[in-house]
Each structure stands twice: as structure tokens, then as C-alpha cells.
């Protein structure tokens, strides 16, 4: 399952900057309206199914990849990917009055973190900070700054 930009804070920050992004890349409206909102709704559905399984006593393992654009050095980007994953875990912990928190604490919900940094980024994205269009504001650059839920596994014991 591919889900990017899933936290309300990211949505809010991107939507607040939509006008700035559109100055550089005027065709981003579809991304803001369809992709961001659609992926957030997918995430809520996934959370609903996960919560139902956890409440039935099932144990789950969630595999989450973190990515970054190539704008900074490799080590920085790996750490940035880790922070993105941690932001997701923090959001999960606080979701709907901390519904997932007891399952995270008890180990019934385990998060497997897979930080990739810039290693999977497309060559279309510039690593030159002076090339703001291709390093920050292009759709390709935006899509590099993400996390992906790649698997939700039911753990049999």
C-alpha cells in the first residue's frame, strides 16, 4: 500500500504553501486535491481495519518505508527518513484518542522501520539547492518526501 504525506500537519503545511508551489509548478492542483486527500482517506480506512484486528487480540506488524529527496547529504537524508517514519508512529500513537497506544506498548502492534533516504529517488529531482524548481517545488521532488506503508502482517503465535 502506497501512502504519502499522511499526517495532518503535512497536509496543513502543504496546503498553506500550495500557492507558492503553484508559482513554480502550476499543475500541482490535482496533486493537492486528489492525491493528498485521497491518500489520507486510505490511511484512515487502513487504521480502522488495523484497530478492529487489534481489538480482536490479533498481533500486527506494520512495515513502513521512509524516503527523502537528494537535496542533502546521504546521512542527513537517512536521518530525515527516520524522522518521517517517527512522525508517522507519533501520529499513529495519538490517532483517535490514542487508540493504538496500548497496542504499541504491549507489542501487539510492531512497527518495522525501513529508512531509505535518497537511495531510491528519481534522477529527475535535483540535489542542487539553487535549483528550487527541481529540488523542492516540482511534483517529482514533492513525491520523494514521503513514507510508504508497504505491508501490514498478521503475526501468528
Regions found by a protein language model. Name each.
Residues 27, 34-49, 75, 79, ...:
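Extracytoplasmic/secreted proteins, especially bacterial periplasmic and envelope-associated proteins
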Residues 13-14, 33:
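Conserved, compact domain cores that house catalytic/ligand-binding motifs in diverse enzymes
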Residues 1, 64-69:
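Short loop/turn segments at strand-loop or loop-helix junctions that form parts
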Residues 70-74:
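Short, solvent-exposed loop/turn segments at secondary-structure junctions
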Residues 2-4, 9, 15-23, 41, ...:
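Periplasmic OmpA/Pal-like peptidoglycan-binding modules at the C-termini of bacterial envelope proteins
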Residues 66-68, 81-84, 115-117, 151-153:
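A mature extracytoplasmic/lumenal domain signature
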Amino acid at each position: 500500500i502506497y501512502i504519502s504525506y499522511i499526517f495532518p500537519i503535512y497536509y496543513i503545511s502543504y496546503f498553506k504553501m500550495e500557492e507558492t508551489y503553484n508559482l513554480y509548478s502550476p499543475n500541482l492542483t490535482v496533486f493537492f486535491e486528489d492525491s493528498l486527500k485521497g491518500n489520507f482517506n486510505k490511511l484512515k480506512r487502513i487504521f480502522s481495519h488495523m484497530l478492529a484486528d487489534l481489538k480482536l487480540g490479533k498481533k500486527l506488524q506494520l512495515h513502513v518505508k521512509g524516503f527523502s529527496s537528494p537535496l542533502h547529504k546521504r546521512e542527513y537524508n537517512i536521518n530525515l527518513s527516520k524522522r518521517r517514519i517517527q512522525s508517522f508512529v507519533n501520529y499513529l500513537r495519538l490517532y483517535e484518542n490514542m487508540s493504538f497506544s496500548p497496542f504499541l506498548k504491549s507489542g501487539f502492534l510492531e512497527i518495522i522501520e525501513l529508512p531509505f533516504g535518497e537511495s531510491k529517488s528519481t534522477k529527475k529531482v535535483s540535489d542542487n539547492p539553487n535549483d528550487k524548481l527541481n529540488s523542492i517545488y516540482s511534483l517529482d521532488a514533492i513525491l520523494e518526501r514521503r513514507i510508504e506503508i508497504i505491508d501490514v502482517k498478521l503475526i501468528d503465535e
